[in-house]
Structures are given as structure tokens and as C-alpha cells.
Amino acid sequence: MFESLWLQLQHPNTQWVLAGTLLLGTASGVLGSFVLLRKQSLIGDAMAHSALPGVCLAFLFTGQKSLPFFLLGAALAGLLGTFCIQLIPRLSKTKEDSAIGIVLSVFFGVGIILLTYIQQQGAGSQSGLDSFLFGQAASLVRQDIILIAGISAVLLLLCIVFFKEFTLITFDLAFAKGLGIPVRFLNGLLACLIVCAVVIGLQTVGVILMAAMLITPAITARYWTERLTGMIIIAGITGGVSGVAGTLLSTTMKGMATGPLMILSATLLFLFSMICAPKRGLAAKAIRLMRLRRRTSREQVLLAIYEQYEKNNLCVTVESVRKKRRLSPSLCLKALNDLEQERCIERIENGIWQITSKGIEKGYHTALKQRMYEVYLMHEMELANIESDQDYFDPDRLPRETRERLYSLLKLYGRMPERRKASHDAEKGQIANEF
């Protein structure tokens, strides 16, 4: 397999296709980042479907299969579709998503009708226009690939030159207008770049799948970073890798189109990112949720033990803790073992624990934090200027006046935690009445 792949890579046409799909994937990923952040993912799909009638009309007017004419016709049809998407909501009460659906289906339907008409003509069956539906990179010749690679390189260059301006109109359009930046021109330029990226991918990826090539690398990159620069770089790399992987797979798998394999490669990278990304991935979220659940159960068990300590019941069991907190036996036992490892409690008999001096101190602060938060919720209108999230509520960071006010309310309600220390000898001999 590897020997045949190596032999295929020595072929000049394979090398040109690899270079073309690499640049196409990179340009699609970079521009797709702006499309995703501007919440215009469906517009890319509509542009791709709108391009089909332009390809068919270009063939009808020229009578020959010429990729430059096809790209020109597809670009004009894509721009017309984009204009219609923006025009329909202005002239009617139709929302933008409905306008996208209308334009997508109407243009694609017209394209299918024209494609069927062409293939019923004498030379239509030889035109190969059906390759624009799903893509057929193997049918590209050297001149076609040079054209696609050249346009992709120009798109990347323009994205680099106008990076600051595109970033500004993506995140804060009103601020850009206030600075006197030509927003309308930049929006039009970005739309033209997106149309060009869609158009040059039609012969390789196809009308139906090109939107996925535009969006999937951007979504993949979003899992790995919070910064736009990093997102664009990762999206470009993801798109390029997907293009190369799809080309290599189609080279080794006879009869398989390059476009679907490129999308499949991008989808696999997306699934890997969705699961394994360090911050946004499902695995990382599951680990954080598990740690949060374990920390919360540990705090709840410590609070239950501390409340027993305030009532002079120094020893606890799993059942006595579960009477105070609704926890499963396994989770409660795990929390008790964690507290024992932290030296907040110590085991005096099998299944019986007692609180230590460290546990008293930690339980005091935990109880104080929770009870102050409860009092804050009772007087939220009076104390509305402090952090309202319990996870970030820290009494030590509160203003002195606010903290003293909460202390006085705790004393008023009799909820102030006790900080007394019991003698260790007395603790060892005392067992709670529940046992």
C-alpha cells in the first residue's frame, strides 16, 4: 500500500492536486473562521448551492468545458445569491434564515434543471458538469490546479492584509463605523472572498459538500483556542491537513472521490477535537464535572460533620452524614475517605470518623462562606454590589463594611459558626447518639 502511494506521489499530477487541495483547504479554513464568528454558516451553504446555475449558464454560453469560465459564472451566481439573501429581508418581513432557505433551494433547483437540460443535449453527456455536485479532483488538469492554487494564495494574502479590519467588523461593527472604517466595502470584500473560496472548491469538493469544508475546520479550531489569531491558524492547518488527507486517501482507494474524503478527514479531526480538546472537549468537561461533583460532595460532607461538631457530636458514620446530606453511599464514603486523606477527619473505629483540628478550621471557613451566602440571598437587594455566584463568593474579598454587615446578620439569626476547640482526649471518648 505504501509503495503504491509513494509511486503515486511521484506522479506530477498527484503533486499538483496535493498542492491545490492544500491551499484550498487552508483558504477555506481561514475564511470559514470569519463566517463562523459572524454567524453566517448557512450563507456559505447557500453560496455553494447558488453557484450551480452559474456553472451551467457558463457552459451554455461558451459551449465548452473551461474552468475559468465556470468559476466566473459560479462567482457571479454566488454573489447574486448573496445579494438576494440580503435583499429579501429588506423588502419583506421574511427573516434572514428563511431568506437563506429560499435562495438555497431556488438556485439549486434552477441549477439541477439546467444540468438536466444540458445532459439531454448532444454534447451534454460529455460536459462532465455533474462532477460539480460532489467534486472530482482527479479530472483537474495542471492549468486548472494552478488557477485554483493561485486564487487560494490570493485569498490568503488578502486575509492577512485586511486581518485587523475583518476582525473589527466581525466583533464590533458599530465601533468600526465610529472609527470611520469603510464597513460596507469591507463587508462586500469579505463576501467576495467567501464566494471565491466556495467557487474554487466546487470542482474539488462539490456544491453539496463545500459548505462543510468552509465551516468544519473553523469549528474544529474553536475547540482549541479562545483567540482569533490562534483560531485562524488552527483552522487553516486543519483545512490543509484535511485536503491533503482526502487526496492521499482517494489516491490509494480506487473509485473514491476526493471531495467526500476531504470532508470525512475534516469531520474526523472535528470529532477528535470535540472529545479531546483540553478546555472545550467532552472528555475535559466530563473530568471537570467529576472533579466539581467530588469537591462539592466533600464540602457537603465536611459541613455535615461540622454541624454535628457544633452539637457536640464529634463522631460520624456514613449513615449519619447521609441523614444530613442527600448523597449516595458510595459518594459519601468516597468523600469521607478524601477528607481522611486531607487529615480533616480521622478514623477511630471501622466505619466511624471524628473531626480533627484541621477539619474544624476548614469546616468553620466552609460553613461561614455558605451561611454568609445564604444571608446575602436573604438581603440581596441591600447587598447587590457583591459577587452573586456561590462558587466565587469569598468573604475575605468582600469590603469591610459588607463583611461586618453579614457578620451582624449571622449573629442576629444565630447562624454564626462556632470556632471553639474541643480537647482531643474528650473527642476520642465521645460517640454520637445516633450510633
Curated annotation (Swiss-Prot):
<comment type="similarity">
    <text>Belongs to the ABC-3 integral membrane protein family.</text>
</comment>
<dbReference type="GO" id="GO:0010043">
    <property type="term" value="P:response to zinc ion"/>
</dbReference>
<keyword id="KW-0812">Transmembrane</keyword>
<feature type="transmembrane region" description="Helical">
    <location>
        <begin position="143"/>
        <end position="163"/>
    </location>
</feature>
<keyword id="KW-0813">Transport</keyword>
<dbReference type="InterPro" id="IPR001626">
    <property type="entry name" value="ABC_TroCD"/>
</dbReference>
<feature type="transmembrane region" description="Helical">
    <location>
        <begin position="68"/>
        <end position="88"/>
    </location>
</feature>
<dbReference type="GO" id="GO:0006811">
    <property type="term" value="P:monoatomic ion transport"/>
</dbReference>
<keyword id="KW-1133">Transmembrane helix</keyword>
<dbReference type="InterPro" id="IPR037294">
    <property type="entry name" value="ABC_BtuC-like"/>
</dbReference>
<feature type="transmembrane region" description="Helical">
    <location>
        <begin position="228"/>
        <end position="248"/>
    </location>
</feature>
<feature type="transmembrane region" description="Helical">
    <location>
        <begin position="189"/>
        <end position="209"/>
    </location>
</feature>
<dbReference type="InterPro" id="IPR036388">
    <property type="entry name" value="WH-like_DNA-bd_sf"/>
</dbReference>
<dbReference type="Pfam" id="PF00950">
    <property type="entry name" value="ABC-3"/>
</dbReference>
<comment type="subunit">
    <text>The complex is probably composed of two ATP-binding proteins (MntB), two transmembrane proteins (MntC and MntD) and a solute-binding protein (MntA).</text>
</comment>
<dbReference type="GO" id="GO:0005886">
    <property type="term" value="C:plasma membrane"/>
</dbReference>
<protein>
    <recommendedName>
        <fullName>Manganese transport system membrane protein MntC</fullName>
    </recommendedName>
</protein>
<keyword id="KW-0472">Membrane</keyword>
<feature type="transmembrane region" description="Helical">
    <location>
        <begin position="17"/>
        <end position="37"/>
    </location>
</feature>
<feature type="transmembrane region" description="Helical">
    <location>
        <begin position="98"/>
        <end position="118"/>
    </location>
</feature>
<feature type="transmembrane region" description="Helical">
    <location>
        <begin position="255"/>
        <end position="275"/>
    </location>
</feature>
<feature type="transmembrane region" description="Helical">
    <location>
        <begin position="42"/>
        <end position="62"/>
    </location>
</feature>
<keyword id="KW-1003">Cell membrane</keyword>
<dbReference type="InterPro" id="IPR036390">
    <property type="entry name" value="WH_DNA-bd_sf"/>
</dbReference>
<dbReference type="GO" id="GO:0043190">
    <property type="term" value="C:ATP-binding cassette (ABC) transporter complex"/>
</dbReference>
<dbReference type="GO" id="GO:0055085">
    <property type="term" value="P:transmembrane transport"/>
</dbReference>
<comment type="function">
    <text>Probably part of the ABC transporter complex MntABCD involved in manganese import. Probably responsible for the translocation of the substrate across the membrane.</text>
</comment>
<feature type="transmembrane region" description="Helical">
    <location>
        <begin position="166"/>
        <end position="186"/>
    </location>
</feature>
<keyword id="KW-0406">Ion transport</keyword>
